[in-house]
Amino acid sequence: MKWLKRLTVIVGTFYRYRLAGLCASLMGSGWICALLKMMPQSSKLKNEPPAVRLRLALESLGPIFIKFGQVLSTRPDLIPHDYAVELAKLQDKVPPFDARLSREQIEKSLGQSIEKLYAEFETEPIASASIAQVHKARLHSGERVAVKVLRPNLLPLIEQDLSLMRFGAAWVERLFSDGRRLKPLEVVAEFDKYLHDELDLMREAANAGQLGRNFHNSNMLIVPKVFYDYCTSDVLTIEWMDGTPVADIAKLKADGIDLHKLADYGVEIFFTQVFRDGFFHADMHPGNILVAADNRYIALDFGIVGTLTDYDKRYLAINFLAFFNRDYRRVATAHIESGWVPADTRAEELEAAVRAVCEPVFNKPISQISFGLVLMRLFEVSRRFNVEIQPQLVLLQKTLLNIEGLGRQLDPDLDLWKTAKPFLVKWMNGQVGPKALWRNLKNEAPDWAQIIPSLPRKISALIDENRQQEMRDAYIHLVKVQQRQSLWLAVIAVVLLLILLLK
């Protein structure tokens, strides 16, 4: 009955932070919403804005709900802007767990004692969060490493909270008129995947390895080496990196770091990941970035990454180029062509809505325009038009906001458009023309070589399948007709019988 106890805690928090009225206002109208507004509410925090009360409630419910709020903050297509801003303030910081448990977890996962695994191992963790904590160590070969270890017995607690979230999301969709638009089950499913990805440290090791290969010998970014022999799904051993936290501007200046070049590097690294690699570090907040003495960035924490298809890249390139040319008609048609917009959407209405939210942004000097803000405004319009925004693009928008904020902290005069435009134009030019056509033909040739010989057989099978389906449909239709006829015959027989009896 642990789930019942936990549910009681959640409902109590719901009352204590006056969230009944908030839910009613977010969910639209209907008798359920009216009932929620009539519920008695705690007098506590009555003067605080609803978004603040929601953040405080999630903080009080613990690490899993804090992470849920962080994920929700990246969905401006689903929640109002002020809620997204407030939930972004949630901090995932918890006290470290017992060092003895940490040692036991490492030894159990790697199958050897700490002494055999590491020449030195610092018992006191250097960082701690809700999912894992990090210890400093040294391998017997001499390399200094960071050892990340998952909190023990975490999975049952996560599954319990996720089950309750799924239960609540299902009822929200059933009971509230606006429930489907908010897509609660989709949000919880996305959060479920996000959490389970973070719980697999072998996946994080693979992410770090991929990013390291993409930026091998880069003059802009250092990615720590992964020691795969010391990694499992519960333990990650990665190269220890020395550097200055990127947010420590005073120290960077004192060390003679070129802040202007560093800001440009950040933007260039981001767009290289997006348009060259289609694979990007999606958690690039200042806490995960150091700066080396040679003016290069050092990336940390690879638990969250995003991947982009050529279709996603095309969507981004078309929209950014159209935005900065103020071609809002092209933005609208790009969304309709994507198939993410309801079929009955009128391009003129979408164009007018995009113009209304974006024109004020583009009234500023181009060096002051925020790419991340442009995407956020676009997602806000999407919410009104029920556009299906892809999760990887939401991750990208959050990452872009982080990169922009960081870049302008280093260099207030940073011109993102100047750095980004060559990437966009180069990528778009690479998608059209004879060279692009020849490249695509070469890429597709092996598939066509396999498909063409079997094409007649597959076409024949498809025709047969269609015929069989037509026969099945005809049979079902015939059965339904016979059932209706039988029903009417039975009704007529009953009516005739009643007439005879009444005589």
Curated annotation (Swiss-Prot):
State what protein this is by name: Probable protein kinase UbiB
Q: What positions does the domain Protein kinase occupy?
A: 120-491
The record, for Gene3D superfamilies, names:
Transferase(Phosphotransferase) domain 1 (1.10.510.10)
The alphabetized UniProt keywords are: ATP-binding, Cell inner membrane, Cell membrane, Kinase, Membrane, Nucleotide-binding, Transferase, Transmembrane, Transmembrane helix, Ubiquinone biosynthesis
Its annotated pathway reads: Cofactor biosynthesis; ubiquinone biosynthesis [regulation]
Topology in membrane: Multi-pass membrane protein
Q: Where is the active site?
A: 283
Q: Where does ATP bind?
A: 126-134, 148
Q: Which SUPFAM superfamilies does the protein's record reference?
A: Protein kinase-like (PK-like) (SSF56112)
Give any GO molecular function from the UniProt entry.
protein kinase activity
Q: Which branch of life, at top level?
A: Bacteria
Family, according to the entry, reads as follows: Belongs to the ABC1 family. UbiB subfamily.
Q: Name one GO cellular component term.
A: plasma membrane
Locations listed in the record? Cell inner membrane
Q: What is its EC number?
A: 2.7.-.-
Q: Check the record and name the Pfam families matching this protein.
A: ABC1
Biological process GO terms, please? regulation of ubiquinone biosynthetic process; ubiquinone biosynthetic process
